[in-house]
Amino acid sequence: MYAFFFKTSNHWIQFLICFCLSLAPFFAHSIDEDPIVVRLSTDSSLVPLYLAPFTIEQTNFSPSYLKQLEDILTFDLNHNGSTYLSKRNASNDQLANAGELEDLGIAQTWQAQNIFYVIKGIIKENFLQVFILNTNTQNLKKCDPVMLTGDLSQDRRLIHRIADTIHKALFGVEGVASTKILYTVKTPLVDNKQKLSSEVWEADYDGENARQITQEKSFCVNPTYIPPKKGFLSGNFLYVSYQAGQSKIYIANLKDGKGQRLLKLKGNQLMPTLSQQRDKIAFISDATGNPDLFLQLFNPETGVVGKPQQIFSAKLATQSTPSFNPDGTKVAFVSDKDGSPKIYVIAIPEPGTSLKNIKATLITKRNRESSAPAWSPDGTKIAYCSRTDGIRQIWIYDFTTNQEKQLTQGPINKENPSWAPNSLHLVYNSADTNDSQLYLINLNQTEATRITSGKGEKRYPNWELRFDR
């Protein structure tokens, strides 16, 4: 049982930590503008594909290296939430290399196996070109050749972009394979094993190409990307650091990770989140004596605008983990104002609005304890974690049906869900003594995949938000 009421700043900040733990264009002309088929509904079945082995015409790359690239594409196509790869066999591999892919006879053989599309890659010298066959129409789409570098880190990202190009060719919307995720890694300090540090890291969506961003040798939590302008990538992020003693919000760029204080506000600050419009930051602070919800106007070019506004407070209650809706007019957050922690939504009040006139709407009703809401980029859902039969699981609240649905299963506690830009995928962290790693899941494939491993506790994942370019 958690104790929810504290009298000092240090007490509530310790509680909030425990509360959180408990609770540029690519291939622009390579495909037609019109998609082959538009089909991306969480109620639809996955589309079967066949990925033929890469055909090697002439190259200096080793077979083992090319197999690594093929495995990356395999992972991407099996985890995009829209397709799955049919089991490979020798006869189909031969079929993919028997003459022209779009030949009627070949296409009919694929159809007979209920394979909708065939993906074939040809490597010639340093270039990889991908072909997409629609077995129903015999339509063959060709992606522009891309030059491989021989550096696995760089080529992995090229393969991710190819996977997203394939997804757009089939469904008319971008995939998420080329996106990135921020998170924290907690480890003992190298020069002082008795002291723990938590630094901000960034990785590809599959957990690979991980790199450390901050170098504070202090304790960092709650990293969150600053949403980019349309057509751009995220370049900066917010996070919370204890380098000055109390928890404060910092802003840093992804290149050097050197943080600067964002707010000149007394007390502790935690859990910053930004609106998609990049003009508002919601966060939690005890500046007025209680851990309450605050709003700060923001300009990504010049910084904070004016002073922060307290937008929700409840007597003897703790507020936490805010999340904006897509148009920035509402905030979901956690409060234990009615006893146990639950998720509420408020409309952003006008400046000067009395706190007494701000009414919160209860969202989660099925479970006693709920936390860490994350509003989907399309605005239709909120993901959150909720204690279910003693285990914290990821749940989804659907605004179209006003229903709550359990997404994850299993004995491991799950926390801190974060949506991908497509509002289909989620990343979250496990939170057990011997397992604090990141997991990937989507609404069409509810068997989670672990994407991190190794030493250190990985927590607070935040999926970068991208807008159509």
UniProtKB/Swiss-Prot annotation:
Gene Ontology CC: periplasmic space
UniProt name for this protein: Protein TolB homolog
Keyword Signal belongs to the record: yes
NCBIfam families given in the database record: PRK01029.1 (NF002183)
Signal peptide: 1-30
Compartments in which it is found: Periplasm
Database matches in InterPro entries: 6-blade_b-propeller_TolB-like, PD40
Family stated for the protein in its record: Belongs to the TolB family.
Keyword annotations: Periplasm, Signal
